[in-house]
């Protein structure tokens, strides 16, 4: 299915419900359909880089749009959490981050910040010859062996800061008390602060463990562990591109 009605579209999409009946549907890809924005919609409604869907399709087909350092020519390509979208000809670079109102939003970032992607480890697989495969949240995989294996054999939900498009790991942030984190899902999505307490569940820890964060203003908020993304040590990583 190429299109869906606007009333069937994910609730958070920034599109007018009465403009047209049909709207572009995300293609299956690195992000779930209900957690992503089709690339053409991102250009038109979020970035205001074009006036019409036809214009969006044209610059995408012409190879002028990059997602995570790679040219994407599919106007239905799903763009999601922490993706880096660039239009070099327009000197435009943005990162997709969680938002407390609209679930996903964009922030402008510098050329230096656009070199880095932040993504969580969701699970790990041991392959032949002792190679460890890290399966990341956006569908990509990283193979570790030798010194890298001992250095980056980290717990699931650890956030990796990787260079684009080579996928070289530069930094890792593990979820623990004291680190700076952002909530990426649930009713508190978009809120951020230091992790002050982690209450581990007896079973299904990733799903049911409860994490308490403290904002810079002293406010506290809670969410399940699966909704937490570590983004720095004492404060947010400078290359995230957002001032928190």
Curated annotation (Swiss-Prot):
It comes from the Archaea. It holds the Pfam family S4. Keywords: Ribonucleoprotein, Ribosomal protein, RNA-binding, rRNA-binding. One of its GO terms (cellular component) is cytosolic small ribosomal subunit. GO terms for molecular function: rRNA binding; structural constituent of ribosome. This is Small ribosomal subunit protein eS4. SMART domains: KOW (SM00739), S4 (SM00363). SUPFAM superfamilies: Alpha-L RNA-binding motif. Residues 37-123 form the S4 RNA-binding domain. InterPro entries: KOW, Rib_uL2_dom2, Ribosomal_eS4, Ribosomal_eS4_central_region, Ribosomal_eS4_central_sf, Ribosomal_eS4_KOW, S4_RNA-bd, S4_RNA-bd_sf. Disulfide bonds: none annotated. Signal peptide: none annotated. The lineage of its organism: Archaea, Thermoproteota, Thermoprotei, Sulfolobales, Sulfolobaceae. It comes from Sulfolobus acidocaldarius (strain ATCC 33909 / DSM 639 / JCM 8929 / NBRC 15157 / NCIMB 11770). Belongs to the eukaryotic ribosomal protein eS4 family. GO terms for biological process: translation.
């Amino acid at each position: 299915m190429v299109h869906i009605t606007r009333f069937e579209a994910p609730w958070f999409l920034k599109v007018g419900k009465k403009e047209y009946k049909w709207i572009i549907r995300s293609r299956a890809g690195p992000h779930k359909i209900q957690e992503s924005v089709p690339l053409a919609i991102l250009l038109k409604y979020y970035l205001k880089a074009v006036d019409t869907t036809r214009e969006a399709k044209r610059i995408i087909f012409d190879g002028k749009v990059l997602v995570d350092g790679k040219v994407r020519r599919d106007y239905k390509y799903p763009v999601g959490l922490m993706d880096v979208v660039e239009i070099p000809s327009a000197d435009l670079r943005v990162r997709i981050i969680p938002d407390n109102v609209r679930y996903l939003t964009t922030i402008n970032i510098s050329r230096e910040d656009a070199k880095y992607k932040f993504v969580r480890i969701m699970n790990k697989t041991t392959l032949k010859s002792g190679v460890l495969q890290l399966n990341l949240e956006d569908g990509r995989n990283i193979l570790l062996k030798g010194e890298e294996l001992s250095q980056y054999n980290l717990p699931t939900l650890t956030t990796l800061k990787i260079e684009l498009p080579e996928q070289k790991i530069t930094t890792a942030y593990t979820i623990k008390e004291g680190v700076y984190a952002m909530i990426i899902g649930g009713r508190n999505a978009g809120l951020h602060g230091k992790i002050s307490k982690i209450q581990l569940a007896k079973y299904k820890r990733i799903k049911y463990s409860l994490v308490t964060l403290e904002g810079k203003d002293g406010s506290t908020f809670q969410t399940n562990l699966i909704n937490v993304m570590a983004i720095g040590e004492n404060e947010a990583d400078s290359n995230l591109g957002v001032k928190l």
